[in-house]
Amino acid sequence: MEVRYYLDPDTGQPHIYGHGVTEAEVEYVLRHPGEDRPGSDGSRHALGQTEAGRHLRVIYVPDEGAESLFVVTGYELRGKPLQAYRRRQRRRRR
């Protein structure tokens, strides 16, 4: 799967870097999502846990008819969104 990243116009670096997230973490969550939900304007939200144990939300747009996608952003889940994700995961396991 080819993964492309939104580049921050100010730095020229992937936008995820501004959130302290690496490409390896994003790609791991995309390959092993706990949830993959529809977003707005054709985007999708993959939520999952990295190998290091961090919980991330990755917002991406799949390319039509191709094995590739465009990552808009990714960031660590914290607070109430993290609690809600964990609650949904517990309910799924029952």
Q: What residues fall within each predicted segment?
A:
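Ribonuclease/tRNase effector modules and their secretory precursors
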Residues: 1-94
